[in-house]
Amino acid sequence: MRKVAIYGKGGIGKSTTTQNTVAGLAEMGKKVMVVGCDPKADSTRLLLGGLQQKTVLDTLREEGEEVELEDIIKEGYRNTRCTESGGPEPGVGCAGRGIITSVNLLEQLGAYDEEWDLDYVFYDVLGDVVCGGFAMPIRDGKAEEIYIVCSGEMMAMYAANNICKGILKYADAGGVRLGGLICNSRKVDNEREMIEELARKIGTQMIHFVPRDNFVQRAEINRKTVIDYDPTHGQADEYRALARKIDENEMFVIPKPLEIEELESLLIEFGIAN
């Protein structure tokens, strides 16, 4: 079972990219579980046809210790297994702590057991690695390979670099490695070349360039992944390609994060700062 975590700055399209990629893997016949690690609890909506599923933390709050696995895992597109860790009530408690509680409970209830015959577990993790709780999939060896969703925008690249610092910190202890950058295009000038160069400097690869297409939003409005909504659309093939590249990937590295000056000079070199 491959344990994958998807990171990236808030609003970059992690949940969309994760779900569309998982749909591609499921279409290939892979058995996948998606664990949403975001208090917004939107990491599985498209796989479940728009169903806002009850989160692990909400279920725990209401049921106490009497939680069964079927209370917190739903079957989605092509038998993907979907669960959302959820978060505390706004203004109360620590969302990172909630992820730790949720993943531990999933383990106790046997969500990862061999009977489920899982090929992949995907963790869709909130924003930047800003606190220890959100770094938990990296830190505790829950995830073994990380993909960072980014774009040619400065803050997305800055966040990607910060996430690399987190991976570097825990690489020895947790055995986690960076599998590559996924460029979720924002149509920035020289975007593909810039992210390829960023990847090269960090010591990794740009595993796929996902072109911007409003069809992704149209599929989302219809509460589906692109592959589910219109399997013949060109954008569906982009996510199939990304799924295939992840499935075949053999490049796993300990990243070499850039100094801020290096990052800024990269932005200047490719014209974004002009």
Swiss-Prot record:
InterPro entries in alphabetical order: NifH/chlL_CS, NifH/frxC, Nitrogenase_Fe_NifH, P-loop_NTPase
UniProt cofactor note: Binds 1 [4Fe-4S] cluster per dimer.
Disulfide bonds: none
PTM per Swiss-Prot/TrEMBL: The reversible ADP-ribosylation of Arg-97 inactivates the nitrogenase reductase and regulates nitrogenase activity.
Enzyme Commission number(s) of this protein: 1.18.6.1
Superkingdom of origin: Bacteria
Reaction catalyzed: N2 + 8 reduced [2Fe-2S]-[ferredoxin] + 16 ATP + 16 H2O = H2 + 8 oxidized [2Fe-2S]-[ferredoxin] + 2 NH4(+) + 16 ADP + 16 phosphate + 6 H(+)
Residues that hold ATP according to the record: G8, K9, G10, G11, I12, G13, K14, S15
Cofactor(s) demanded: [4Fe-4S] cluster
Range of residues in the leader sequence: none
Modified residues (ADP-ribosylarginine): R97
Ligand binding ([4Fe-4S] cluster): C94, C131
Matching CDD domains: NifH
GO BP terms: nitrogen fixation
GO MF terms held by the record: 4 iron, 4 sulfur cluster binding; ATP binding; metal ion binding; nitrogenase activity
Keyword annotations: 4Fe-4S, ADP-ribosylation, ATP-binding, Iron, Iron-sulfur, Metal-binding, Nitrogen fixation, Nucleotide-binding, Oxidoreductase
HAMAP family: NifH (MF_00533)
Record PANTHER family: LIGHT-INDEPENDENT PROTOCHLOROPHYLLIDE REDUCTASE IRON-SULFUR ATP-BINDING PROTEIN
Subunit structure: Homodimer.
Family affiliation: Belongs to the NifH/BchL/ChlL family.
Known function: The key enzymatic reactions in nitrogen fixation are catalyzed by the nitrogenase complex, which has 2 components: the iron protein and the molybdenum-iron protein.
Protein's name according to its UniProt entry: Nitrogenase iron protein
